Swiss-Prot record:
Known function: Mediates the nuclear export of encapsidated genomic RNAs (ribonucleoproteins, RNPs). Acts as an adapter between viral RNPs complexes and the nuclear export machinery of the cell. Possesses no intrinsic RNA-binding activity, but includes a C-terminal M1-binding domain. This domain is believed to allow recognition of RNPs bound to the protein M1.
Protein's recorded name: Nuclear export protein
Coarse class of the protein's main subcellular location: virion
Highest taxon listed in the record's lineage: Viruses
InterPro entries associated with the record: Flu_NS2 (IPR000968)
UniProt keyword terms in alphabetical order: Host nucleus, Host-virus interaction, Transport, Virion
Motif (Nuclear export signal): 12-21, 85-94
Further remarks about this protein from its record: Average number present in a viral particle is estimated to be 130-200 molecules.
Protein's cellular compartments: Virion; Host nucleus
GO cellular component, as recorded: host cell nucleus; virion component
GO biological process assignments: exit of virus from host cell nucleus through nuclear pore
Subunit structure of this chain's protein: Interacts with protein M1. May interact with host nucleoporin RAB/HRB and exportin XPO1/CRM1.
Annotated Pfam families: Flu_NS2
Length: 121
């Protein structure tokens, strides 16, 4: 993962962790956890692409690779919808900027994961 994406993830996670949403901190903590999980998954796919031979061992170790990939895309779609919803309801400019950047990052990561998965298939 390039350094800009890493710093974007870190920046957004840090800012989201400081936010106090009116609805529920549990919802936000869930989003943060999914962001972190998505980052780790994206990193592991990127590493597998770099070492194409490892993909075969990944498939052997994990016969449910495609199922996991499908699940990650569902998580991304859920996060995108959740971020869009938060963006619509928030009036705080700090939160709006954070959620706009989170949305942009999610769309970029979705594109990267798609590209990696096509290379691995």
């Amino acid at each position: 993962m390039d350094s800009n994406t890493v710093s974007s993830f870190q920046d957004i996670l840090m800012r989201m962790s400081k936010m106090q949403l009116a609805s529920s901190s549990e919802d936000l903590n869930g989003m943060i956890t999914q962001f972190e999980s998505l980052k780790l998954y994206r990193d592991s796919l990127g590493e597998a692409v770099m070492r194409m031979g490892d993909f075969h061992s990944l498939q052997i170790r994990n016969g449910k690779w495609r199922e996991q990939l499908s699940q990650k895309f569902e998580e991304i779609r859920w996060l995108i919808e959740e971020v869009r919803h938060r963006l619509k309801i928030t009036e705080n400019s700090f939160e709006q900027i954070t959620f706009m950047q989170a949305l942009q990052l999610l769309l970029e990561v979705e594109q990267e994961i798609r590209a990696f998965s096509f290379q691995l298939i």
